[in-house]
Amino acid sequence: MEALWQRTGDPLGDFIRLVLLVEELLERLGAPKEDTLGAKLRSGAAEAFFQSHPEGPALRGRLWRLVELRNAVLHERAEVPSWAFSEGRDLAARLLAAVERQGFYSRAGGTARMALPEAPAPPPPPAS
């Protein structure tokens, strides 16, 4: 999947790309690629991760909240709230640290991957 995330100034597109990065990280933890995002969170690989993580239950809840927001944005055309980006970045960072520990990324590779989500959103284009 190799999802890269970078703020473009389009909140909907930025949010969907951030969710794709989270989804890729779940796959790298061992969740089946062909599953839905919800099924990936319920997969044995995700459950093993939650059980091994000190904040596992809270992290699971936060990821489900992100999935619910994603569904509302995609299916109900809900607006993307500003908190979604900081929450998504934090969740992606925690998942990335887990896949680094499992050897799927080197520290340098992981740092490069997280440099994009840490970048601020570009300014909106000037009105014509």
Regions found by a protein language model. Give the residues of each.
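Amphipathic alpha-helical interface elements
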Residues: M1-E68, A72-P126
